[in-house]
């Protein structure tokens, strides 16, 4: 899994 990709996905969901 790509941690950066997941972080970006989560950040996108939070915003």
UniProtKB/Swiss-Prot annotation:
GO terms for cellular component: extracellular region; membrane; other organism cell membrane. Keywords: Antibiotic, Antimicrobial, G-protein coupled receptor impairing toxin, Immunity, Innate immunity, Mast cell degranulation, Membrane, Secreted, Target cell membrane, Target membrane, Toxin, Transmembrane. The keyword Membrane applies. GO terms for molecular function: toxin activity. It is found in: Secreted; Target cell membrane. Expressed by the venom gland. One of its GO terms (biological process) is defense response to bacterium. The keyword Secreted applies. Its main location: secreted. Belongs to the MCD family. Eumenitin subfamily. Cationic linear alpha-helical antimicrobial peptide. It exhibits inhibitory activity against both Gram-positive and Gram-negative bacteria, and moderately stimulates degranulation from the rat peritoneal mast cells. Its mast cell degranulation activity may be related to the activation of G-protein coupled receptors in mast cells as well as interaction with other proteins located in cell endosomal membranes in the mast cells. Binds preferentially to charged lipid membranes as compared with zwitterionic ones. This is Eumenitin. It comes from Eumenes rubronotatus (Solitary wasp).
């Amino acid at each position: 899994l790509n941690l950066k990709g997941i972080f970006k996905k989560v950040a996108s969901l939070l915003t």
